[in-house]
Amino acid sequence: FQLILIITLPAQILAKDYYVYCAAESEDEVALIRFDGKKAYVEKRIQVGVWPVEIEGPHGITISPEGDYWYLSMAHGTPYGHLYKYKTGTDEMVDRVELGLFPASMEISNSTGLLYVVNFNLHGSHEEKSTVSIVDPEEMIEIDRVETGVMPHGSRLLNSGMKHYSVAMMSGELFEIDAMRMAVSRKIHTKPINNMKNHGMHNMSHKNAKKMDHSHMMSNSDKKGMAAMGHM
């Protein structure tokens, strides 16, 4: 009888909404998207960053295990990027901390509670090794940087939260970091990708973007304005 009752309940009663934060790197904007099981709706557009007339480039995004806060890496800087902390619900900026060159993908460990974010580093000749920043997301303090390979990207942890993995894009090496020791515990050479150096085209697009006149793209400048500068 209970099974029949559940099946015959109206669909709207059983429906559950899911929410996703989605970053738009070219707009300095994060969209809060609601999915009701059938369709997706943009519930809110959140202007992020503190520079009212510059593109800061929101790249990586993750949410705290409790769902109280969400974190955003801002790739562009002078020259270093930042990690931003926002409150879910109000989506107000709480704090930020400076990291390395072009911080990108990130994830929070279930075991340590720390946040691991790769410093992708699109600058320069792409021959220098970069790092993974380890951040205390409660206090918003960078507590360590672990050197890995050239242009590390991707940031994933085991379900246990004990091992962190990222890939050095220019060499194809997979780096394993011991989350407790905060040190590289293993380096795995993956199969070389054909024409890996063609990734330089991606770099060229970023270089060209930096040379472009963004004035015609600043549709968000009025929205951010000097009020955003108050977060600095």
What annotation goes with each model-predicted range?
Residues 1-10:
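Bacterial N-terminal signal peptides
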Residues 11-232:
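Predominantly soluble domains enriched in secretory-pathway, periplasmic, or organellar proteins
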